[in-house]
Amino acid sequence: MYAIVEINGQQFKAEAGQKLFVHHIQNAENGATVEFDKVLLVDKDGNVTVGAPTVDGAKVVCQIVSSLVKGDKVLVFHKKRRKGHRKLNGHRQQFTELTITEVVA
């Protein structure tokens, strides 16, 4: 059984026992349980239910493993030709690591 769930504006395929890295969830504590009820699709033993826009009564229950995980560094380089202007910026996106405990449909 799996579900397509929307978390922080992104869609994920969720199955029980799976780990997900989603964009940082504000005020999240390690070990806390979070429920997401914006389920767009549920596949239960080959029986597919598509929501319009969401499936009623369906939810995905997750446990927060780590509330703050930093992604790989992305380097942004700006240069203006012939002027000697160079600028290098770095950015590391913050993520939250979740473990899906169950999919309720």
Swiss-Prot record:
Keywords: Ribonucleoprotein, Ribosomal protein, RNA-binding, rRNA-binding. The keyword Nucleotide-binding does not apply. It comes from the Bacteria. GO terms for molecular function: rRNA binding; structural constituent of ribosome. GO terms for biological process: translation. GO terms for cellular component: cytoplasm; ribonucleoprotein complex; ribosome. Part of the 50S ribosomal subunit. Contacts protein L20. Belongs to the bacterial ribosomal protein bL21 family. This protein binds to 23S rRNA in the presence of protein L20. This is Large ribosomal subunit protein bL21. It comes from Bacteroides fragilis (strain ATCC 25285 / DSM 2151 / CCUG 4856 / JCM 11019 / LMG 10263 / NCTC 9343 / Onslow / VPI 2553 / EN-2).
